[in-house]
Amino acid sequence: MMMLAVAAVLAWPAAAQPAVAEADFIVRDFGFGDGRRLPELKQHYRTLGTPQRDAQGNITNAVMIGHGTGGTGAQFLVPQFTRLFAPGAPLDLATHFIILPDAIGHGGSSKPSDGLRMAFPAYDYADMVRAQGLLLDHLKVKRLRLLMGTSMGCMMGFQFGTDLPGRAAAIMPLACNVIPLAGRNRLWRAMAINAIKADPDWNGGNYTTPPLNGLRVGVALQVMASSAPVRMQADWPTRDAADAAAQRAMAQGLAGSADANDRIYQLEASRNYHPAPHLARITVPVTWVNSADDVINPPGVGDAALQVKAMPQGRFVLIPESAETRGHSTHTWSQFWEGELKALLARSN
C-alpha cells in the first residue's frame, strides 16, 4: 500500500552501495481502456544490478518488482528488502538485473497532478500492466526471469500473468487476492475517496489548497488497513505510547500523501480487477504469499488456497501471525519469505 518515499539506503557498507540508475521511457500515443489517449505517457523506472544478454542482445536475467498503491519503486530500497540483493543472496546484483518501475499514476510516471487533474484518463491495472510490457520491450527484456510484486504490485502480478502469459519465467505475488475488490477492501478505499471529494477545498479536483481534512481521513484509514495488531500491541503497550504513535503516523502519512487527485485515481485503479477466471493462463511456477495478520487480505477472504489450484504450478503460502510479522507490510520484510523465493527460483530454473 501507500509507502513514504525513502532514500536508497541499502544493506551494504556505505562505500560499497550498489548504483541505482533512474530513467524515463516515453510511449507515444498510448491508448487507455477507457478509450482516452495520451500523446505521451512517461514511465519512470529504476534499475540495479548486472544485465546479461543473449546473442540477440536481449536481457535474460531481469527481475521486475511492482510497488503498492501510492508507492514507487523506491519503496524497495530499504534494508529489509535490499538484503535480497546482497552478494550470495537470492537476487544477488552480480547475477540479476533489477527493474523497479513507477506504475502509471505514481511517482515519476504520468499522473493526474502533471496537469490534467480529473481529466486524466481513468487508468486501471490492465493499462498499467500493458505499459510495463512496453517498458520491457524498450529495455529488450523478452521474458523476465522473475516477476515480483507487493500489494497493488501483487495484483498487477496476477494481471500481468493473465494478460501477458509467458513473459515471466516465474511469478511471486505478495499480499493480495485474485477476487474483485469488494467488502472491507473496497469500503476503506471508497471512504478515503469520498472524504477527499467531500472536503470543500477539493473543489471538483481544481483546488489551490490541498484538501487536508479529506486526506487526513484517508491516512487514518490507511494506517488501520495496514495495521498488525499483535506487533502493534508489543510496540505500543501503553495508552501514551499508542497516542504518540497515532500522532507520528498522521504526520508521516500526510507528509508522504500523494496529491489528492492522484490518490483518487490510485484507489480507483482496482475497480475492475478480477483475474480469478483467467488464472489457468498462468502456466509458469508461481509462489503466492499472504500473511495471517494482513487486515486487507485476511485468511477468511478470497480462498487463496483454493484459487491457487487453477495455476498448474501454483503454490500458496500463508505466513503465521507473530509479534514479528508486520501485517500487510510483511510483504516487504523478506526474512519471512526468503526461503520461498529461493525455492521458486530453483523450480523455475
Sequence positions of predicted segments:
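N-terminal cap/lid subdomain of alpha/beta-hydrolase-fold enzymes
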Residues: 46-114, 303
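Active-site nucleophile elbow and catalytic-triad environment of alpha/beta-hydrolase enzymes
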Residues: 262-278
